[in-house]
UniProtKB/Swiss-Prot annotation:
Pfam families: NADAR. Belongs to the YbiA family. This is N-glycosidase R617. GO terms for molecular function: hydrolase activity, acting on glycosyl bonds. It comes from Acanthamoeba polyphaga mimivirus. Gene3D superfamilies: YbiA-like. It catalyses: 2,5-diamino-6-hydroxy-4-(5-phosphoribosylamino)-pyrimidine + H2O = 2,5,6-triamino-4-hydroxypyrimidine + D-ribose 5-phosphate; 5-amino-6-(5-phospho-D-ribosylamino)uracil + H2O = 5,6-diaminouracil + D-ribose 5-phosphate. Keywords: Glycosidase, Hydrolase. Transmembrane segments: none annotated. It comes from the Viruses. Catalyzes the hydrolysis of the N-glycosidic bond in the first two intermediates of riboflavin biosynthesis, which are highly reactive metabolites, yielding relatively innocuous products. Thus, can divert a surplus of harmful intermediates into relatively harmless products and pre-empt the damage these intermediates would otherwise do. May act on other substrates in vivo. Its EC number is 3.2.2.-. InterPro entries: NADAR, YbiA-like_sf.
């Protein structure tokens, strides 16, 4: 759903507005390089996030399981099982991890970058009623009737996407 001020998205199922591409679960391949060498290939930004969560906490077992998986719900499940998880440490790193994953996703897929840039200066909003961290904790239909400063969620994913958009606007 799109308004004059907002671009709302939720879920990776294809829709006419093309906003499903903003979802962490949207299936798209992209690669990560370290020192000029290919380090890993991902099937979604969700896989990147959960793999880097496992790396952050030194859990190579779950890192390998996450990298072997292509089903988004299973990737999320495995990410929630990362050993040695510390929420304070995760909170310090999660925004940067998700930003870098999405930066790779959009920079390596020009059609996705084009759609991101087409949002102009609108506020990009993950309208997930069940997510108050990455989303706003409301549906799009609920959000349009509530002032933005009253939304219960942080919309971190929307902020990530707007940061990447700003980096690429001319």
């Amino acid at each position: 759903m799109e308004t004059d001020k907002y671009v709302f998205f939720h879920g990776a199922n294809k829709n006419q507005a093309g906003v499903h591409i903003f979802s962490q679960w949207f299936p798209v391949n992209f690669k990560e390089y370290l020192n000029g060498e290919e380090f890993a290939e991902y099937v979604s930004a969700e896989q990147y996030m959960m793999a880097h969560k496992a790396l952050l906490f030194g859990d190579m077992f779950h890192f390998k399981k996450i990298m072997e998986c292509s089903k988004q719900c299973k990737i999320k499940y495995l990410g929630r099982r990362v050993r040695n998880f510390n929420p304070t440490i995760w909170d310090k790193h999660k925004f940067d991890i998700v930003t870098e994953g999405n930066r790779l996703k959009f920079s390596q897929n020009p059609d996705l970058m084009k759609r991101l840039l087409e949002t102009g200066n609108k506020t990009i909003v993950e309208a997930s009623p069940s997510d108050k961290i990455w989303g706003i904790g409301l549906t799009a239909q609920q959000a349009v009737n509530i002032p933005e400063n009253k939304w219960p969620g942080k919309n971190l994913l929307g902020k990530v996407l707007m940061k990447i958009r700003e980096e690429n606007q001319q």
